[in-house]
């Protein structure tokens, strides 16, 4: 018998922490290796955490709603067949490393994750004048965790700095702490009966990314009206037989995504990203699509959308939306997007100005398809199915001319869809 420790896994390349949203096991439950034991929410994705061992759950260390750093223990599992002697021999080495976080090893300096610090680590280090370059982390990949800093403070390791270092470091915390009171006073206070909702996981990431996008990217907007009467008639005529044959819905959105992917191939400038002293024009056309839940927004990616048929895109939309609803979305599902298409029409919007999905250069809002009287080329008035396409663009990367031509091409593709168009 041996007691094994399960730690918070790294559910994505840049993920530093995770929040336990739900335990799927309880103390005393028997689990097999790879059985899901918890649902964890990060700023990138919701995912089930599988057990690394076969055995019996002895203790749930993390609580539901608690945020833990990658590498921190979440539970203990009693296993069979392990050698207790080996387990005991390993423990002193681990505890010795934990008790001496100040000691800087040559190996730790080479670890790629060492320079990635969480906000909690940066705050504690700033408050106590700790040089993070002199701290060896005990987290995954040598990452410095909040516990490393707290342990250093508790053991008095901070005072090992010489007086000159302390003099230099002393002003930093004061200047760093000056803006904090101003920032705190700008937030509204809760009154009796108000409900406070902690900002964690996906909502925290949305807030951070949207703020970064809005403050860093000079947004500009343009809109174009499209007549999709023939597309609507064609889709409605085949949707039932398509569902019966394929097993999933043929949505209007699939036609829009396909049209955008085709136009991006013809206007590669739209498939670009700002990178400081250069603009990166992406080779792959990976369409990010916004999928909302009751309290969150996810942006999974349809990879190589330009190479897929309308049917293939419809299948991806259905599959990714289901993954979001079931909480099965992976980090890979969210990575690699080069252009975002948002189906704002699904909740009745007719005009909107989207915030660009950083670091992409544009986002297209597909609004509601509505019947409107339209003056035709022959001067007659007819009722047509019309939709507004609203484009937000990064004016560092894109100008009105190329965006207008791009939207015009999307419009042309959509208005040319009829009964001769193949969805396969």
From Swiss-Prot:
Active site, UniProt feature: 395, 399
Peripheral subunit-binding (PSBD) domain mapped to chain residues: 116-153
Ranges for domain Lipoyl-binding: 3-78
Keywords assigned by UniProt, alphabetized: Acyltransferase, Glycolysis, Lipoyl, Transferase
An example Gene Ontology CC term for this record: cytosol
Region (Disordered): 82-115, 154-193
Biological process, per Gene Ontology: glycolytic process; tricarboxylic acid cycle
Cofactor note text: Binds 1 lipoyl cofactor covalently.
N6-lipoyllysine: residues carrying this PTM: 44
GO terms for MF: dihydrolipoyllysine-residue (2-methylpropanoyl)transferase activity; dihydrolipoyllysine-residue succinyltransferase activity
Tagged with keyword Cell membrane: no
Cofactor annotation: (R)-lipoate
Stored PANTHER family: DIHYDROLIPOAMIDE ACETYLTRANSFERASE COMPONENT OF PYRUVATE DEHYDROGENASE COMPLEX, LIPOAMIDE ACYLTRANSFERASE COMPONENT OF BRANCHED-CHAIN ALPHA-KETO ACID DEHYDROGENASE COMPLEX, MITOCHONDRIAL
Role summary: The branched-chain alpha-keto dehydrogenase complex catalyzes the overall conversion of alpha-keto acids to acyl-CoA and CO(2). It contains multiple copies of three enzymatic components: branched-chain alpha-keto acid decarboxylase (E1), lipoamide acyltransferase (E2) and lipoamide dehydrogenase (E3).
Stated family: Belongs to the 2-oxoacid dehydrogenase family.
Quaternary structure annotation from Swiss-Prot or TrEMBL: Forms a 24-polypeptide structural core with octahedral symmetry.
Protein name: Lipoamide acyltransferase component of branched-chain alpha-keto acid dehydrogenase complex
Organism for this UniProt entry: Bacillus subtilis (strain 168)
The gene coding this protein: bfmBB
